[in-house]
Structure formats: structure tokens, C-alpha cells
Amino acid sequence: MSKKKAEKKKGGFVRAIRNIFLFLIACALLILLGLTGIYIYVKHDVNPRLLKEEDATALSDVDCIIILGASVKNGDTPSPMLRDRLDEGIALYKAGCAPKILMSGDHGSEYYNEVSVMKNYAIKQGVPSEDIFLDHAGFSTYESMYRARAIFGAEKVVIVTQKYHLTRAVYNAKNLGMDAYGVAAAPINYGGQTIRNIREYLAISKDFVMTFIKPEPTVLGNPISLDGSGDVTNGAD
């Protein structure tokens, strides 16, 4: 092969690599644009439903306050993040926001039970046991909201979680058929928040799709009326 042909072949290879690189960059930018567009839409859609505590207590006919689970320590102690969610939800209950509390979290094994830890904490704070319902299969934000509507029959709810997570939670509930509002737990700076913010940015797009196609959650079950006693949910349903 002549030197001229070799240089031409090498030049063609370099151009091909460059074109592939530019194509991948263009795809990445389009994906980023799509994710950002969904993020902005969801934030704008839900923003009027994010309330201060005093505004939430002024709502009428709220079926329940939904407190979303988070990690527990040593099997029986709420993590700081979960404790702050519980404190806000309990404050709303005591202020008359709703007659019942629905605690939704992960009870995926006999060795890990977020919701029982949550209920025990609330009882120690003076909330009657019969006013606390447990959703043992709230394995994700989407599943918690799906089950709140499908299993517990909730129609109008106030959701409590941290501010960074609240938009997605309310969006899920709203698009699964509930009149949903949200109140953020106390704005504490927890370690690793930057990573959580990035995950939430991606999770908003995931749940945007989930609420469009509406797949059933991992676990369903028989209906449970919020008009009865929450003690019927003390065991896994």
C-alpha cells in the first residue's frame, strides 16, 4: 500500500471515530434535554400543591397523612431523616390535618421493618395506635402511592417527606388518582445530599413514565378501609 493510500485510510478512520464521538455527545445532550424538560414540567405541575404546615391544616376532608419510610438504625430506631418525617407528620395529625396516618415503607423481610418502627415512635409521641395504618409493601415512592389509592382507598392526602423528595411523591399520588398535597419535613442538611439530589433528578423521569403506564406494584392485597382501626395492619398484609 502506498504512503498516500495509508494516510487516506488513517484519515477515514479518524473521521469515523470523530463522527461516532459527536453522535454519542448529541445523544447524551438529547437525553439530558429530555430529563431536564420532564423535571421542569413535574416541578411546575406540583408546585402549587406543596404547602406549609399551617396551610395543610386548613384543608378539609383529608383522608390521611402519608408518611413515607426511610432507613432505620439497629432494627428499632428511626434514622434522623425518618425521625424528621415522623415529627412533621405527627405535628400535622395533632393539628387536625387528618384523622388517620398512613405509614408506608419497606418491610421486605422479618429482619427489616420500617413501618413498625415508625408506628412505635408515633405511639410514644401520643398518637393513638388505632389511628395509625401501616403499608408494609411501600418498596418505592410509586408503589406507596399506588397502594395508598388501591388498597387503602385514599382520595385526598397530605404527604410528608423531605423537600427534595416531595415533588415526586406528590406527582405520583396526583397522577394515580388522588387529590394530593405535600408538606416538607424540617430542612436539615443530611450527609450525602448531593447524591440524593442526582438520584431524584433521574427518578422523577422514571416515575413520570411509571405514572403514565401505571404498572401494578410488587404486592397488592385486599382493600383496607381507613374508617376502621389501623391496628388491623399491624401484621404484614
Regions found by a protein language model. Give the residues of each.
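A transmembrane-helix-recognition feature enriched in membrane-embedded lipid enzymes
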Residues: 197-219
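A structural signal for short, hydrophobic/glycine-enriched beta-strand patches
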Residues: 37-198
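N-terminal type II signal-anchor transmembrane helix
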Residues: 5-54
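Short linear elements at protein peripheries
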Residues: 217-237
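A general structural signal for short secondary-structure boundary/capping elements
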Residues: 108-114, 181-184, 203-210, 226-232
